[in-house]
UniProtKB/Swiss-Prot annotation:
GO terms for molecular function: toxin activity. Changing T3W: Moderate increase in anthelmintic, insecticidal and cytotoxic activities. Gain of activity in causing an increase in intracellular calcium concentration on neuronal cell line but no change on epithelial cell lines. The keyword Membrane applies. InterPro entries: Poneritoxin. Membrane-perturbating peptide with a few moderate activities. It is insecticidal, since it induces reversible paralysis in insects (L.cuprina) after 1 hour, but fails to kill them. It is also antiparasitic, since it moderately inhibits the larval development of the major pathogenic nematode of ruminants (H.contortus, IC(50)=23.2 uM) and reduces the motility of adult males of the other nematode B.malayi. It does not show antibacterial activity (MIC>40 uM). It is not cytotoxic to HEK293 cells and does not induce hemolysis in human erythrocytes. GO terms for biological process: defense response to bacterium. It is found in: Secreted; Target cell membrane. Keywords: Antibiotic, Antimicrobial, Membrane, Secreted, Target cell membrane, Target membrane, Toxin. This is M-poneritoxin-Nc3b. The keyword S-adenosyl-L-methionine does not apply. Expressed by the venom gland. Belongs to the ponericin-G family. Its main location: secreted.
Length: 31
């Protein structure tokens, strides 16, 4: 259970960072 919780947290973290990188790329493309 502990490992599953850690994996879920890691997935959420990567998802948030991925969205941030997409936003940064979109802003760079628009500028």
């Amino acid at each position: 259970a502990g490992t599953k919780e850690w994996l879920n947290k890691a997935k959420d973290f990567i998802k948030e960072k991925g969205l941030g990188m997409l936003s940064a790329a979109a802003n760079a493309a628009l500028n």
